[in-house]
Amino acid sequence: EERAESVDTIHKLPRVERFGDRSIEGRRYTDPGQLDLELALVFRRGWVVGCPLWQVSEPGSWSVLNETSPFSVVVTRDTNGTLHAFRNACVHRGSSIVKACGKGTALRCAYHGWSYSLDGRLREVPRAEGFGGVDPHAMRLKAVSHAVFAGMVWINLSEDPEPLATSLMGIDEDLEPYALSEMEPIQERVFSVPVNWKSMMENAFDYYHAAEVHRHTIHAHVDSAPELAILGDHMCQNLHIAPYKWRRMLDEHCS
């Protein structure tokens, strides 16, 4: 209920004021047109995380990103162990092929029954005689650029993207000591709120609220204010947590 009231307040604000000589219109956080622009200029041009690598660790497994979006992507591990990424759209009529993570020998469109091997090749066309000169061997799912880093499969929807390592602007070196590829999920929770991605991201970058909301956890073990750095198209925030106090607290509450 409290979260719903906060979201409703954002909707009603004509402007979100800040210190200095600038202000930000509240609609930037809720307007569908603004979101469409950001999707086109940011998310469909840059590298984004498609799925954790463990979801497609076994041959025959697949994972899906944005299953309800027209720009949905499916990541597969074929029977030979090779990783692939494709637009989640049947080459026949564009219907979504995958609705959820799974495992099997083929991807099958639930609309007309066209099926594909996990390497993207068209495998079966029901009543193929009605399609004249269609050559199944010449048709396949549209491939999407992908790369693996930090235990994640990254994808890029643009036609000729720069290498992931170039895009990360050195952040990959900063993250390497954390061995993210060795981490395993312990809990998954899904929240649905009527705001777009910026509200979630800005909350993560907003250390200003930590003293009030997280006073007995993170804030109690932070040595100093976070360090912010602009790296190309990215913003990096380093938060220095007192290691021994933090580790002791985790041991007491999580062991």
Protein language model features and the residues they cover:
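Short, contiguous pre-domain boundary segments
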Residues: 9-25, 181
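Generic structural "secondary-structure junction" signal
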Residues: 21, 26, 31, 44-45, ...
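Non-catalytic accessory segments flanking enzyme active sites
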Residues: 26-69, 73-74
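Generic structural signal for secondary-structure transition and capping sites
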Residues: 43-47, 95, 209
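Rieske [2Fe-2S] iron-sulfur-binding domain
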Residues: 55-159, 163-173
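C-terminal catalytic domain of Rieske-type non-heme iron oxygenases
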Residues: 57, 82, 88, 147, ...
